[in-house]
Amino acid sequence: MRRGACILLLFAALSASAQERPGGKVQWRCDLDFHYYFDNLEFDASGSRVLRSGTTHAAVLVPTLSAQVQGRRTVHGLTLGADLQHDMGSQTWRDLPREGILYYSGTTRTQAGVFQGVAGIYPRTLMRGWYSEAFFSDLNLFTDRNFEGVLLKWRAPRFYTEAALDWMGQRGYDRKERFQIISAGTWQVARVLSLGWALDYYHYAGSELAPGVVDHGLLEPWLKLDLAPGTEWQEISLRAGALLSYQWDRRRADRPSTPGGAEVTATLRRWNVIVQNNAYFGGDLLPLYDGVDLAGHPYGEQLYFGHRFYFGFYDRTLVCWEPRIARSVRLRIGARIHFTSNGFMGWQQTVGLRFDLGTPLRGK
């Protein structure tokens, strides 16, 4: 009740402030974002040595209310909301509110392009860059839906770039200081050719109980060739990139290690059916995964957010269908098969449904 009253007071203050300014006008927008997620992992064929069999089955609702004020050159906005998630089969609704959403956004349009800055607790969906699953796995994208920090974006006719800061933890007795810097960009060189990059630097510092610092960095410059323009195909593309990593446990190693490799992704898309193959060739991009900090706590998924199979040769095949149901409804049904140098590891079946209903409200 207290949180709800605070939110109402904040919006009332913003509305009153805008009305007091000459020409001030607040545009209100109510948004409801619903996400249904089903992901069934079957890895018994490999003895669940790398990934365990299991199912993630959840429904997410993100209601938000936004207010925008038109300035001289910039549109200023404030958004308040909540991230609600229910895990199917759970016997309690107490954990339904997962995280609050509160962020400021400023958008400026120029002749060269559009710049947008965001600060606060904002949804990951505001980011538009491309990142390999070596950076973020499909499960991580679902479970870590919001960032706490800032986001900067620039879009021009043939160029896009973004940079984000996610402050994930403040140092305490048993709490680590953690923050992540992420960036991506795309340059449309020609109709069928684009160049780009993805970058991630993760600072995983120690707590008072377990001092020490671990640095994890990953950079992927890439190029993409898409032969679909001018044909009946939606996509006929080949993307190739070099994965360059930087790993350093400062308390246990005198110098960092720099394992790396190459990644190639081929995609065919027609009639909203996608067939995609991804192959990675190279070294172990997760060398500290099985390591522990000075208190004996494993690094594991606390240090690496990408797919677990990037420890050597890795091949993944995806087949999925994304039918067009409505403008605001997206459905995805698919299956993925995973191979490493040890052979067949397992497969997964996924269903995702997203309904994003944005409703402008009458301005004051």
Task: Indicate where each model-derived feature is located.
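Positively charged n-region of N-terminal signal peptides that target proteins for export
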Residues: 1-4, 18-19
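Hydrophobic h-region of N-terminal signal peptides that target proteins for export
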Residues: 9-17
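Beta-barrel outer-membrane channel/assembly domains of diderm bacteria
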Residues: 18-99, 106-110, 347-363
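Outer-membrane beta-barrel proteins
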Residues: 20-22, 49-53, 92-96, 107, ...
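A generic beta-sheet turn/junction motif
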Residues: 23, 56, 67-73, 110-114, ...
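Exposed, low-structure sequence patches enriched in small/polar residues
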Residues: 33, 156, 160-162, 168, ...
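Flexible, solvent-exposed loop segments that connect beta-strands
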Residues: 44-51, 92, 133-134, 295-302
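Surface-exposed coil loops of outer-membrane beta-barrel proteins
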Residues: 116-186, 201-203
